[in-house]
């Protein structure tokens, strides 16, 4: 017998939960469109190589990967940024830069399901391609602040920020190849500090200022102050390192000016392999997972064979944001009128339908009654379901050109002209 449960790690949503998801999406869309971002829609199914080219074959264990009927190895997308880069390379390179893109869509990861972690979930995000200015990083962070302020979560979240470019510069100076770099960053992302230190011990034999600095970042990055980090970076005589810390300091100052709570964690890295500069995550103090994240990725377009195109972006987890809203006790039940139109006999159905259409055109949620039971039993049924008004149509109403309105909240009934119907429905309940 077929199971009625959704697949493990996937969820069904109905009514209020669906409304919350759409509400989050709508607020996100309005926020980013006002900032000049244009929507992109890409397929859920992509060539597996699109993700493995930068992320490596080990991604296979955390993805839905399969062969299609043409024996092509394809995957359900685990994120959307690579798809946006593919779209850019395929058809958007001629657009003026910077190019501002946003997306909303479902993604799939074969993770072990747990609180806040799903195998199917929704992401909404932005990508800004074609600018290496720190102003681009500030723009997307400001946009993130705008969105969470719009949905009344700004004062309940905090940003964790760093600049992964600091690690990249040090690793490059130490001549670590890309595979070693990504492995070290993966270990740091997973909190496996001792394993990372072991690799560094094997590869760095001297006791240079660079070695001291990287060990300080790994073991003491969270508590390391930017001013202290700047002094230590200057000792390495790597000017690029100083520049990256200065960029991070500017971002922190901008976030402070926006009154957005944040911490600078110089040991913080993110798991995605393509980040090259400032990175960030949004956390809520009472949740064990982040609800959004992003950063700069200046080399990803080149990885896919394009010209160097600096880029920065972020993605929010829609279900995680919904969880944060629910956990905070924010209610979404609408106080808008909910109307049922009752035709007392079949001869007045055309007139009842015209009333239904008129009310829907005016923006009211309106249904045509299809319960063929006495009116005396309809009233309590609709009241129990949360309806606010019954519009009753019979031969008497047709003849008089009026309608009978039953207010289920105030338990009152009046007769009114059709042209006054919307005013009667929207009158406040005292």
From Swiss-Prot:
Substrates-to-products reaction catalysed: tRNA(His) + L-histidine + ATP = L-histidyl-tRNA(His) + AMP + diphosphate + H(+)
Q: Supply the source organism for this entry.
A: Metallosphaera sedula (strain ATCC 51363 / DSM 5348 / JCM 9185 / NBRC 15509 / TH2)
Does Kinase appear among the keywords? Answer: no
Please provide, alphabetically and separated by semicolons, the GO molecular function terms listed in this UniProt record.
ATP binding; histidine-tRNA ligase activity
Q: Which GO terms describe its cellular component?
A: cytoplasm
Main localisation: cytoplasm
Protein name per Swiss-Prot or TrEMBL:
Histidine--tRNA ligase
| Enzyme Commission identifier(s) | 6.1.1.21
Matches recorded under PROSITE patterns = AA_TRNA_LIGASE_II
Task: Note one Pfam family from the annotation.
Answer: HGTP_anticodon
Domain of life, per the record? Archaea
Give the location in the cell: Cytoplasm
């Amino acid at each position: 017998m077929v199971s009625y449960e959704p697949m493990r790690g996937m969820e069904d949503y109905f009514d209020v939960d669906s409304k919350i998801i759409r509400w989050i999406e709508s607020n996100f869309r309005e926020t980013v469109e006002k900032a000049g971002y244009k929507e992109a829609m890409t397929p859920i199914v992509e060539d597996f190589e699109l993700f493995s080219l930068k992320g490596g074959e080990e991604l296979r264990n955390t993805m839905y990967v399969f062969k299609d009927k043409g024996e092509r190895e394809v995957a359900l997308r685990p994120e959307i940024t690579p798809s946006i880069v593919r779209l850019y390379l395929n058809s958007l390179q001629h657009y003026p830069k910077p190019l501002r893109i946003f997306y909303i869509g479902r993604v799939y990861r074969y993770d072990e399901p747990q609180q806040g972690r799903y195998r199917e979930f929704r992401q909404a995000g932005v990508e800004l391609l074609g600018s290496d200015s720190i102003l681009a990083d500030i723009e997307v962070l400001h946009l993130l602040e705008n969105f969470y302020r719009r949905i009344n979560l700004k004062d309940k979240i905090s940003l964790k920020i760093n600049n992964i470019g600091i690690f990249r510069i040090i690793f490059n100076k130490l001549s670590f190849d890309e595979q070693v770099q990504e492995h070290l960053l993966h270990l740091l992302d997973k909190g496996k500090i001792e394993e990372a230190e072991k690799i560094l011990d094997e590869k760095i034999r001297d006791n240079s200022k660079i070695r001291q600095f990287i060990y300080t970042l790994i073991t003491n990055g969270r508590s390391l102050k930017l001013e202290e980090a700047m002094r230590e970076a200057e000792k390495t005589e790597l000017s690029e390192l100083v520049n990256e810390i200065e960029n991070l300091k500017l971002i922190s100052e901008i976030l402070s000016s926006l009154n957005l709570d944040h911490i600078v964690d110089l040991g913080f890295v993110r798991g995605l392999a393509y980040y090259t500069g400032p990175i960030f995550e949004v956390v809520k103090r009472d949740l064990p997972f982040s609800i959004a994240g992003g950063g700069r990725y200046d080399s990803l377009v080149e990885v896919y064979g394009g010209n160097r195109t600096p880029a920065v972006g972020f993605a929010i987890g829609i279900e995680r944001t919904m969880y944060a809203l629910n956990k905070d006790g924010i209610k979404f039940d609408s106080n808008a009128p909910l109307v049922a139109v009752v035709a007392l006999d079949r001869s007045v159905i055309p007139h009842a339908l015209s009333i239904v259409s008129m009310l829907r055109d005016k923006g009211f949620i309106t249904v045509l009654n299809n319960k063929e039971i006495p009116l005396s039993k309809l009233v309590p049924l609709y009241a129990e379901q949360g309806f606010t008004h019954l519009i009753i149509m019979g031969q008497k109403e047709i003849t008089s050109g009026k309608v009978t309105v039953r207010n289920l909240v105030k338990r009152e009934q009046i007769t009114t002209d059709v042209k006054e119907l919307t005013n009667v429905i929207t009158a406040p309940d005292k």
